[in-house]
């Protein structure tokens, strides 16, 4: 009986630990082209499904430099993101349907404050905080969309 309880407890704990692992999504290289023609690439997870967009980078403690997450929406709209349950500081670029970066904002870990696009956009690209600034990427630059 004790052996059965031990096996059950071990399996339960193992299942619990594995279910806490952050979900990863398909990755595509996203090219960003600055207005001066310089190009940069981000290995971005693609969040297209509502459940993937809603979860985003929640619970991720480490997001390596040069990686990110591209959120794809069905239509242009005012977008709003927050950092609930997100421990890693991020920067977000709001991108219109033509691939033009319209806004870039830094976001605070765990904050529930809404970071709202100033115009209707179709995409959002989150990267580790400071990545856009470090690479000289600004509003008006373009993303080559997948």
Explain the meaning of each model-derived region.
Residues 16-19:
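C-terminal motif of bacterial Sec signal peptides marking the signal peptidase cleavage site
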Residues 21-146:
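Compact, glycine-rich, soluble single-domain proteins
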Residues 1-7:
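Bacterial N-terminal signal peptides that target proteins for export
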Residues 10:
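Alpha-helical and His/Cys-centered functional microenvironments
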């Amino acid at each position: 009986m004790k052996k059965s309880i031990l096996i059950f407890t071990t399996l339960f704990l193992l299942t619990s630990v594995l279910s806490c692992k952050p979900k990863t999504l398909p990755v595509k290289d996203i090219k960003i082209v600055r207005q001066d023609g310089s190009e940069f690439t981000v290995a971005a997870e693609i969040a297209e499904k509502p459940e993937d967009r809603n979860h985003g980078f929640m619970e991720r403690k480490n997001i390596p430099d040069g990686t990110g997450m591209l959120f794809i929406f069905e239509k242009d709209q005012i977008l709003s993101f927050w950092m609930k349950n997100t421990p890693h500081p991020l920067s977000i670029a709001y991108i219109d349907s033509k691939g033009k970066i319209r806004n870039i904002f830094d976001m605070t870990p765990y904050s529930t404050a809404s970071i709202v696009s100033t115009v209707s956009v179709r995409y959002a690209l989150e990267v580790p905080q400071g990545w856009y600034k470090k690479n000289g990427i600004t509003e008006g630059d373009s993303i080559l969309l997948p």
